A protein has these predicted regions:
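Structural signature of hydrophobic alpha-helical transmembrane segments
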Residues: 16-27, 80-95, 141-149, 176, ...
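N-terminal alpha-helical transmembrane segments of multi-pass membrane transport
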Residues: 1-74
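Alpha-helical transmembrane segments
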Residues: 166-184, 292-302, 326-327
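Membrane-embedded hairpin module used as a gating/binding unit in multi-pass transport
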Residues: 177-250
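Interfacial helix-loop-helix linkers and transmembrane-helix boundary segments
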Residues: 39-48, 81-82, 102-117, 251-259, ...
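Transmembrane helical segments that form the transport core of multi-pass membrane transport proteins
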Residues: 225-310
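Alpha-helical membrane segments and immediately flanking helix-loop junctions
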Residues: 88-89, 96-102, 117-127, 131, ...
Length: 382
């Protein structure tokens, strides 16, 4: 009997009840909140459901010295093997492959000046970088935090895994949170920075883009961007490769796989492992609060920069060629959420003013811009 009691008591020390902390319970509630927002409020469910469940999974308490090989940071555990894709930077380029295979760059090709809006939105990244330095973060940490201004989760993970791996969980959750909150953050800012007259500007329909142009774009884009920032090659190379698969007309099956099955698998593993990395002991710190505050600042600056840059461009454009400033918010790389916001807000003020295709130009330019910015920061600090 004593043997049974002793073994039962030993068993109890392995349970989550015996090892739980207040931090674990708080993070489990955070994970549940993410899942609730995804399912009930439809806030990017494809991202927030895996991340939310990952947060819960990563904060299930267990005895660390038991050698069970179940924790994210325990060598040879299943979660640790999955996590290598985040830690070593494998998942983000594969996500970019899928994005490239899904994306139609016609809006940007037909109106190349829209790429300037995507470039202007990157001011949010460099503005947040300066503020992060002022708050006492190391330069490499500040760079990893600042990239959240692009609202681009894969880019944020890729850069932070190289420059600030100790902050990667908080940075990744921050980036994906602001991607999900695009419909909440951007519309009030767009109304604040534009007049009613500007919101009803009608833009001319984009010209038809030839198949030859669509094929040449990823090749020329790859050469131009990677010659400027070779360190962005893993992201930019896969983005343009995916787009070439889509546009070549001869690799449809590969493009479908990259944009559907492969992309879905990578997003599942990426979201789950990023969520698991937010363990209470590392996540519930003052630095996390600073990161979320800086992420919000970076995202607001990026969105505002795009809108204000369109207003600046309009000062030099002839009357019939002016741009609607509502497409300026789409300069961030939250594709296609920001472009949808531009379109929806435009329809509020003129139900015949469809801005979606116009907004997709700066939106896809923002994807390229954030990858270039990440490459520049990575090259600078390496």
């Amino acid at each position: 009997m004593d043997f049974i009691i002793q073994n039962f008591n030993e068993f109890l020390t392995f349970t989550g009840f015996a090892n739980a902390s207040a931090g674990n319970l708080i993070m489990i509630l955070v994970g549940a909140l993410f899942i609730w927002l995804a399912i009930k409020k439809d806030f990017e469910p494809l991202l927030l459901v895996p991340i939310g469940l990952g947060i819960i999974l990563g904060n299930i308490p267990f005895r660390a010295d038991a050698g069970l090989e179940i924790g994210l940071y325990e060598d040879y555990s299943v979660l640790n093997i999955f996590y290598q894709g985040v830690k070593q930077g494998w998942y983000p380029p594969l996500v970019f492959l899928g994005i490239g295979a899904m994306t139609d760059f016609s809006a940007l090709i037909s109106n190349p000046k829209l790429i300037l809006i995507g470039a202007a939105a990157q001011f949010g990244i460099f503005g947040a970088y300066m503020v992060a330095l002022a708050l006492g973060f190391e330069p490499n940490q500040a760079a990893g935090i600042a990239i959240t201004g692009g609202a681009d989760g894969p880019t944020a993970i890729f850069l932070s895994s190289k420059l600030s791996p100790n902050l990667m969980g908080a940075i990744a959750v921050c980036a994906y949170s602001y991607m999900a909150l695009v419909p909440v953050i951007q519309p009030p800012l767009m109304r604040l920075l534009t007049t009613k007259k500007e919101r009803v500007i009608k833009m001319k329909p984009a010209r038809q883009v030839s198949q030859t142009e669509k094929i040449l774009f990823p090749i020329i884009g790859l050469l131009l961007t990677t010659f400027i920032v070779p360190s962005g090659l893993p992201l930019l190379g896969m983005l343009f490769f995916g787009n070439l698969l889509k546009e070549s007309g001869k690799t449809t099956r590969l493009a479908k796989t990259a944009s559907s099955s492969l992309n879905d698998i990578v997003v599942i593993l990426l979201g789950l492992t990023v969520g698991c990395s937010t363990q209470a002991s590392e996540f519930l710190t003052l630095n996390t609060i600073k990161i979320f505050a800086l992420g919000a600042l970076a995202f607001i600056i990026a969105s505002a920069s795009g809108i204000l840059f369109v207003k600046l461009m309009n000062l030099f454009l002839p009357k019939g060629k002016k741009l609607n400033p509502l497409i300026g918010n789409a300069g961030v790389s939250a594709v296609p959420m920001s472009a949808r916001i531009s379109n929806n807000l435009g329809l509020e003020y003129d139900r015949h003013n469809f801005l979606l295709m116009h907004a997709m130009g700066p939106n896809v330019a923002g994807v390229i811009g954030s990858a270039v910015a990440a490459g520049a920061l990575l090259g600078f600090f390496n």
